[in-house]
């Protein structure tokens, strides 16, 4: 994949990505940061940590700002991914809740596959 995800709002990174037509998902959390990321040209605001306020926060942000794409990360798992999508997230990102470090270290592909399937089923249930 050719894209950039930033941990924080970095207008200079957004500008550089726009110059080279690279999609950029800018880190943001507060409504001000989210709007600033969008106005700077980010394709979406990466809302982190999403688990802090949960799907209700995404829904609350989308109400007055329906034009801004939100990408919740941090605390997204197979049990709540559907709730984030129903709340208005255009996509989500997951790390350790999808690929557990122990399973990766042990090359437990079955466990990783099972988690991926659980995520896929949860997402499919929303469509």
Predicted regions: what is each one?
Residues 4, 68-71, 89-91:
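Short glycine- and Lys/Arg-enriched binding-loop motifs that mark or flank ligand-binding interfaces
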């Amino acid at each position: 994949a050719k894209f950039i995800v930033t941990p924080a709002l970095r207008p200079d990174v957004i500008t550089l990505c726009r110059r080279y037509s690279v999609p950029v998902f800018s880190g943001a959390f507060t409504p001000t940061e989210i709007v600033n990321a969008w106005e700077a040209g980010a394709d979406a605001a990466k809302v982190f940590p999403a688990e802090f306020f949960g799907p209700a926060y995404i829904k609350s942000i989308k109400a007055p700002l329906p034009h801004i794409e939100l990408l919740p990360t941090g605390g997204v798992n197979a049990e709540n991914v559907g709730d984030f999508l129903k709340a208005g997230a255009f996509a989500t990102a997951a790390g350790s809740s999808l690929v557990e470090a122990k399973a990766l270290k042990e090359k437990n592909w079955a466990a990783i596959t099972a988690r991926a399937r659980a995520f896929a089923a949860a997402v499919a249930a929303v469509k």
